[in-house]
Amino acid sequence: MRRARALSTRHLGRMLAVLTAFVVVLPQAASAGGGSVSGSYEFESPLFGLAAKGGSLFVADGGAGVVRLRNGNGKLIAELPGVTDVAPIDHTSMYAVTGAPDRRLYRITDGVVSRVAYLGRFEANVNPDGGEIDSNPFDVAALPGGRALVADAAANALLIVKADGTVDWVATLPEQLVSTKNLKRLVGCPDAEPDWAFACDLPDRIPAQPVATSVAVGPDGAWYVGELKGFPAPRRSSRVWRIEPGTRHAECGSSPDCSIVVRGLTSIVDLSFGHDGALHVVEIDEDSFLAVELGQATMGTVNACDVETGDCTVLTHLPLPTAVASTRRHTYATALSLVPGEAHVVKIA
């Protein structure tokens, strides 16, 4: 299954890069909830991360850098092309991560960008999951003491970085046997095009890489990690893991420091706790990320999940959502996030 592994670890970053080249046609639901809060500001796109602090929203605009939204006005406050997420540290500083090929953690203070750690080198030297060496830092959360948690999607790992740039790994996520039914349906088996004909011969179930796309710190202090689930892009197979704070070198699936708190979602791309304590989980598309890549996107969702019971309810449906964040009063999400000229931020609750 070497081909499947290569697709699974690189699929997300490649898909997002490809989609910026054309407009995806989707149902008109981008104004679900309270409507756009980004006003006339035109993002370079794609939009990946969203954070809230001090009455402002901060958007990781992969085509430009970090954008601050306040009172319906947008301003680029730090140039950082390739940025995939931001996490405020205090009222003047934040962490930001970049995906492949840069693969770094940065600190931004009053608009000045400084390097903290080269995460790609850590993957090359340590390779926590022992698989193919690949790194695509995708999400970041700030911790006390100047530390940061980073979800590395291609490395299938949660990393922790000290303020001095020292990197260690917290946990790796396991493969899982998943159904190939959704893949075969999307590519049109048994009459798939030549590039996808191999999919029609796959068994009913194959191992899928987890693809750690998201991390959030819960009200209980625990660390929560969401998984996309890579090739073959199954539906209802993405999970959210709870990891005990302070954990190091855990292999989730066998370690007592990891437990699954949410199951049955599809292509998770972001996590964030709301003002009410619910875990907000973003699914980029209900038919999986592969549906988006193949131009068959339906709608994505933002869910509110109870991490005690595992129950989730849909807050809203949106086209191509990639991120969610909450202030003390409201919750916001990105929509049409991968489409140049159309990407924006909406209030959903």
Where are the predicted features?
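Beta-propeller fold detector
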Residues: S38-Y41, G74-L80, S114-R121, D168-L183, ...
